[in-house]
């Protein structure tokens, strides 16, 4: 919990968390990207829980300034950003942020569902394993920025996610 509080204090981008958490889901890790000079310009929160279609599932929610590459790296995609043409069609999913819906587009990937959009002038990535866990986004997923003041959330923590670098 202390490490998450440090990330929240230092982050220049949102630290997103679905809230309320989907039923049975736990926070399973977090990380940031940046340096002492520029600060934390990317954040990722890992979650684990039941796949709506059966079996276990993992999810990473990443926020980053353009050009950081944390989302693409954690999604196993080339480059730093989602790439050209990712938003060339109707959105495939939405998230709810502060009573507004933000569109997300599916980015081609193998074995996982990768959704990308833009919220608060930052890239927002949702990466879900296996790809069938993407059904969690059939309805808009409500997200909260853990940097927002006056939040007393009792977060349930689980085992560390293997989806984040050690």
What is each model feature region?
Residues 17-28:
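Proline-anchored loop/turn motifs at beta-strand termini and strand-loop-strand connectors
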Residues 22-24, 52-54, 118-123:
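Short, solvent-exposed coil/turn segments at beta-strand boundaries
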Residues 10-14, 73-75, 121:
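Glycine-centered secondary-structure boundary/capping sites
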Residues 26-106:
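Short, solvent-exposed recognition patches
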Residues 1-12:
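N-terminal cysteine/histidine-rich coordination modules
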Residues 11-18, 46-47:
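Intrinsically disordered, low-complexity boundary segments flanking structured domains
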Residues 88-166:
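A short, solvent-exposed beta-edge/loop patch
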């Amino acid at each position: 919990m202390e490490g998450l509080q440090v990330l929240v204090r230092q982050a220049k981008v949102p630290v997103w968390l679905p809230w309320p958490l989907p039923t049975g889901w736990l926070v399973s890790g977090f990380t940031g990207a940046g340096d002492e000079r520029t600060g934390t310009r990317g954040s990722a929160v890992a979650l684990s829980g039941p796949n709506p279609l059966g079996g276990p599932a993992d999810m990473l929610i990443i926020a980053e300034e353009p050009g950081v590459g944390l989302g693409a790296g954690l999604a196993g995609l080339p480059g730093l950003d989602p790439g050209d043409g990712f938003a060339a069609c109707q959105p495939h999913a939405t998230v709810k942020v502060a009573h507004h819906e933000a569109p997300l587009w599916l980015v081609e990937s193998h074995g996982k569902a990768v959704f990308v959009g833009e919220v608060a002038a930052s890239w927002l990535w949702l990466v879900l394993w296996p790809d069938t866990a993407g059904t969690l986004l059939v309805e808009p997923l409500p997200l909260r920025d853990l940097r927002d003041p006056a939040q007393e959330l009792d977060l349930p923590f689980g085992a560390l996610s293997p989806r984040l670098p050690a």
